[in-house]
Amino acid sequence: MLAVLRSCPLLFVLLGMSLHAHADKTGPVPFVMQMTVGDSDAQRRAFLQIQKVMQDIGPKNIKIEVVAYESGITSLLADNKDTATLVAALSREGVRFKACRISMRGYKLKEESFPVEVEFVPAGAPEMISLQVKGYRYWRP
């Protein structure tokens, strides 16, 4: 019995090492946020949610991509006074922002209307589905 008790600390050390090794292999948990709301205050609040999640959980543990389409496309505009600084700050934390080209055409927007941090995808909804098929978890503000 004494031998078993003496080996318990070793067991906990080995278990901890195993869990740590597993955590390293899984990497950050991926999320994709659908941004389809046109209200700039709601867009700002959604980006503030991302900022809080990144602060609390950390960029090493979570990966976030925002796909903006329909009226949500305006959330990524360089001249959006409510969201432009948040887009820049969150990009520095590793958050990726994607703008839908179909929505850009519908709103008559050009790539030059967006900050350099924004990537462009052919269509927003298929991008959302594609990322979820790849294992991203869905997040809608």
What annotation goes with each model-predicted range?
Residues 7-17:
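Bacterial N-terminal signal peptides
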